[in-house]
């Protein structure tokens, strides 16, 4: 057993800057900690912040939780209670007015004791907790030890579910993945399993904690700050008037006491240059329920605007808020922010818009600083099953990959955790809008008073915490409740539908909506991620927002869409894709690379249908705690198999590991092409009657090494999908739309720029050896075009049967666009290029030719040069070895014979001392057909 030291904890620099009477802030993470449990026959070192699995891993008690089938093998950890115990706390001030414990996050069911006296119990992972322990400190006669006992979340929610007073829902409504009853807890819902991740149900002090001592009665500690910047007169659900001055509303949450004559002032300066924008006093000061609030109208200030990536600069400002009593500073807080308006437009289509060709219905698109724009991006899931080990460095790499793929928005999927501030900081700096959601998904939830009160505190804290970030784009109530759960109830239990609509409105409209509106003027709220929008908003009505639900009119378009179709036979039939105003979820799963599999799976299990590979695939989920989910997972594996077999060469390599790797790559090819087909379709919709202005695919990244919908693997390696996203999210693209039934090919140019763009598209038919087809198959070699702002235009249409193609199986059409135009908020004209291709048959039926790819590396320029010597190289793929994290600036492209492509590798981490370069390889679709 570890003998505790007599710890004297260090005093931190105060978060409340005041030279006269700072509180003393002690970082509890500086203490020594131990971890114990009845399930463990010894005590091991603990840490804060941390989680139980991580401390057991550090102590050598368990293997890597991500290894093999440890998500099953380590369930004993989630089933046990665990206690974190501090070393005795010495050095606390004796002449203090009050002493407080502040926890930024406890996961989840925790009992807190100090000096063997119970202080409090908690039941919400997402809340900040502050407890006055002044009396416990003064009365302490035993060892001044802090203990945090974490109960087993799976067992506790099972007990809640078994209580006769707890709500019960009809069969088939609540979606379980592994552990049941997740809806009874305010904890990361995916901790109990999801179809892309494991169910570890972790516990522990997952965020920092502090002990704070106030030296006098008029002394405060800042807990949270709500900085709201908006246009004067702005209302959440209406478009802001861009001619109005900026308003700054500052609200500081604190404990302690402020004099009634307290004043507030602000100083705003540019973050980069330090240039002062303005300083002024706030008006209408109120002190109520532990918050001090004031407002200022910035009439004479002209800040530079903050814009999303690709639309302008990310101008940032530091706002310093000072609270004083007229003589001295009592509190001072600095927040970095930006000046922008962001608005989700759900208003009805006007007669003028209908006359311009927009289909009737309602809008569903975002506007930034008064401008419509096309939202290009993906869905962010939890980056790790254990948040305590998520680092700023790794997330910076992830966000760098987001903007490298030309994405300007991420939907932060509900039922993970609210993102930490540092991730919003990264988004602020890079121009990534974060559509944020409250943590509810794919289930109905309790609506009793205790549950609602708990949620209310969670909502208020998190809305206020992140409101200053210009990257914050939206608050949504939850995931797929309106689009999936309520319709399921209506179909299966129509007599109970009204009751559950009422429960839905109680939580997402009556409770959450007013709390959002009370704490921010600048952000729109939508009760559900996928929704048909609202009929009306009336702030004085009993139900403030009247949702449209299924009150739809034929021929009208409303709301956003999600789309999952695992029948791969229709994957590239774009008539199957939903027509709507915005696509917020769509996708298909694929395997990670061999390099990622090797991080978690033993060599003997590296084949497509091994038990380990199959059981790490959670699509389809077991729906319970079964460890032999072969029936459901085989359906998911079968879908990926059919996606390959229907369209691509089937790998059949002699070496089993090489064959497994080729199969993994093949599933990624299908996934990437399927997403490309959909994104092209949705982007084309910007110029169609639906006026479609957003596509966010499912999903950005992996939580672990397993089959999933991700485009970025767990360690940061890009799948084929992310390279395709980088390509197809360029500002101006050329896209082929092929109808295999009518044999008609339409070629479109789509632009998301804010002004018309003109240019040309080159159309070049050739056979797969690279030889041009005679007379270019009766196709014009060049087509000129003009495409309107945020629009699309058809530049050519042909029937393949009428083309002079000697053999469709030996034909490829290369499409190359070159356009001139201004990027948003740029005075400089840019040349914009993009290349696409089309084959009249699917890749599996092509008469492929070995392109004899040659790869060279120039150490001086740090570039790779790829050349096809003998044939057309389709899906040209550069791959790098393990030990490196980064991405190629281009990948998955087409090369024609004689063409060279110079490609730089963007290094994010190198553990090979530069030796990785020797193991970079290149392959093409041809290599999928070979035995070696």
Swiss-Prot record:
Signal peptide residue numbers: 1-19
Keyword tags: Carbohydrate metabolism, Glycoprotein, Glycosidase, Hydrolase, Polysaccharide degradation, Secreted, Signal
Glycosylated residue positions: 41, 81, 94, 249, 261, 284, 289, 318, 348, 538, 551, 609, 624, 632, 659, 739, 791
Any one GO molecular function term: beta-mannosidase activity
Metabolic or biological pathway, per its Swiss-Prot or TrEMBL entry: Glycan metabolism; N-glycan degradation
Family in the record: Belongs to the glycosyl hydrolase 2 family. Beta-mannosidase A subfamily.
A GO CC term attached to the entry: extracellular region
Species this chain originates from: Aspergillus terreus (strain NIH 2624 / FGSC A1156)
EC number: 3.2.1.25
Gene3D superfamilies, sorted: Galactose-binding domain-like (2.60.120.260), Glycosidases (3.20.20.80), Immunoglobulins (2.60.40.10)
Main location: secreted
GO biological process terms, semicolon-separated: glycoprotein catabolic process; polysaccharide catabolic process
Active site as annotated: 480
Catalytic activity: Hydrolysis of terminal, non-reducing beta-D-mannose residues in beta-D-mannosides
Stated role: Exoglycosidase that cleaves the single beta-linked mannose residue from the non-reducing end of beta-mannosidic oligosaccharides of various complexity and length. Involved in the degradation of polymeric mannan and galactomannan.
Listed name of the protein: Beta-mannosidase A
Compartments (UniProt record): Secreted
Record note on quaternary structure: Homodimer.
């Amino acid at each position: 057993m570890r003998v505790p030291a007599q710890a004297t904890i260090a005093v931190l620099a105060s978060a409340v800057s005041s030279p006269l009477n700072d509180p003393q802030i002690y970082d509890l993470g500086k203490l020594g900690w131990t971890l114990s449990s009845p399930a463990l026959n010894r005590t091991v070192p603990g840490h804060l912040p941390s989680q139980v699995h991580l401390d057991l891993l550090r102590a050598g008690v368990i293997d890597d939780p991500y290894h093999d089938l440890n998500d099953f093998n380590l369930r004993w950890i989630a089933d046990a209670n665990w206690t974190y115990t501090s070393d005795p706390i010495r050095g606390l001030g004796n002449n203090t007015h009050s002493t407080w414990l502040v926890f930024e996050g406890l996961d989840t069911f925790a009992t807190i004791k100090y000096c063997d006296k119970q202080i409090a119990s908690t039941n919400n992972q997402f809340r900040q907790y502050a407890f006055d322990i002044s009396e416990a400190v003064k009365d302490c006669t035993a060892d001044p030890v802090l203990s945090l006992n974490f109960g087993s979340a799976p067992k506790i929610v099972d007990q809640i579910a078994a209580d006769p007073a707890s709500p019960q829902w009809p069969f088939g409504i609540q979606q379980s993945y592994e552990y049941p009853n997740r809806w009874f807890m305010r904890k990361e819902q995916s901790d109990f399993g999801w179809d892309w991740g494991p169910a570890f149900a972790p516990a522990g002090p997952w965020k920092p904690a502090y002990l704070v001592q106030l030296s006098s009665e008029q002394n405060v500690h800042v807990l949270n700050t709500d900085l709201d910047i908006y246009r004067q007169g702005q209302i959440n659900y209406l478009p802001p008037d861009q001619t109005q001055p900026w308003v700054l509303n500052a609200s500081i949450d604190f404990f302690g006491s402020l004099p009634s004559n307290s004043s507030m002032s602000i100083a705003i300066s540019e973050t980069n240059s330090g240039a002062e924008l303005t300083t002024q006093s706030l008006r209408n000061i109120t002190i109520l329920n532990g918050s001090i609030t004031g407002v200022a109208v910035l009439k004479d200030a002209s800040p530079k605007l903050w814009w999303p990536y690709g639309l302008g600069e990310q101008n940032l400002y530091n706002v310093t808020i000072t609270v004083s009593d007229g003589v001295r500073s009592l509190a001072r807080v600095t927040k970095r922010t930006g000046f922008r308006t962001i608005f989700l437009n759900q208003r009805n289509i006007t007669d003028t818009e209908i006359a311009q060709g927009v289909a009737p219905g309602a809008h569903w698109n975002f506007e930034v600083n008064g401008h419509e724009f096309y939202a290009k991006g993906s869905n962010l899931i939890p980056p790790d099953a254990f948040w305590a080990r998520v680092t700023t460095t790794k997330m910076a790499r992830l966000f760098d990959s987001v903007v490298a793929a030309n994405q300007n928005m991420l939907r932060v999927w509900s039922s993970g955790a609210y993102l930490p501030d540092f991730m919003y900081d990264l988004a602020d700096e890079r121009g990534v809008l974060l559509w944020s959601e409250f943590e509810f998904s794919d289930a109905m939830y309790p609506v009793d008073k205790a549950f609602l009160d708990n949620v209310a505190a969670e909502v208020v804290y998190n809305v206020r915490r992140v409101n200053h970030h210009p990257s914050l784009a939206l608050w949504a109530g939850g995931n797929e409740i309106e689009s999936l759960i309520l319709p399921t109830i209506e179909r299966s239990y129509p007599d109970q539908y009204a009751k559950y609509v009422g429960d839905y409105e109680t939580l997402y409209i009556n409770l959450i909506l007013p709390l959002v509106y009370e704490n921010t003027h600048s952000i729109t709220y939508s009760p559900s991620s996928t929704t048909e929008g609202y009929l009306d908003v009336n702030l004085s009505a009993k139900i403030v927002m009247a949702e449209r639900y299924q009150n739809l009119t034929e021929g009208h378009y409303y709301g956003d869409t999600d789309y999952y179709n695992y029948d791969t036979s229709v994957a590239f039939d774009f008539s199957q894709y939903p027509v709507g105003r915005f696509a917020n979820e769509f996708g298909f799963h694929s395997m990670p690379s061999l390099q990622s599999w090797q991080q978690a799976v033993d060599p003997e299990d590296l084949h497509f249908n091994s038990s380990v590979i199959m059981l790490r695939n959670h699509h389809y989920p077991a729906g319970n705690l079964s460890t032999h989910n072969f029936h459901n997972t085989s359906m998911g594996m079968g879908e990926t198999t059919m996606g390959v077999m229907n369209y691509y060469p089937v790998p059949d390599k002699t070496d089993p590991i090489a064959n497994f790797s080729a199969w993994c790559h093949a599933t990624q090819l299908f996934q990437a092409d399927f997403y490309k087909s959909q994104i092209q379709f949705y982007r084309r919709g910007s110029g169609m009657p639906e006026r479609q202005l957003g596509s966010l695919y499912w999903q950005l990244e992996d939580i672990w090494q397993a089959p999933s919908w991700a485009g970025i693997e767990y360690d940061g390696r890009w799948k084929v999908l992310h390279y395709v996203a980088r390509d197809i999210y360029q500002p101006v693209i050329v896209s082929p739309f092929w109808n295999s039934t009518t044999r008609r090919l339409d070629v479109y140019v789509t632009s998301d720029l804010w002004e018309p763009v003109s240019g040309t598209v080159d159309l070049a038919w050739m056979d797969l050896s690279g030889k041009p087809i005679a007379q270019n198959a009766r196709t014009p070699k060049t087509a000129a075009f003009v495409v309107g702002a945020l629009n699309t235009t058809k530049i050519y249409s042909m029937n393949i049967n009428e083309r002079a193609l000697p053999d469709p199986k030996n034909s490829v059409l290369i499409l190359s666009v070159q356009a001139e135009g201004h990027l948003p908020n740029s005075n400089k004209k840019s040349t914009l290029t993009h290349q696409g291709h089309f084959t009249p048959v699917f890749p599996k039926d092509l008469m492929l030719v070995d392109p004899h790819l040659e790869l060279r590396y120039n150490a001086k320029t740090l570039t790779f040069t790829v050349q096809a010597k003998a044939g057309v190289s389709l899906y040209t793929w550069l791959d790098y070895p393990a030990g490196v994290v980064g991405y190629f600036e281009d990948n998955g492209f087409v090369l024609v014979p004689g063409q060279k492509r110079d490609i730089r590798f963007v290094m994010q981490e190198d553990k090979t001392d530069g030796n990785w370069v020797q193991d970079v390889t290149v392959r093409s679709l041809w290599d999928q057909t070979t035995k070696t």
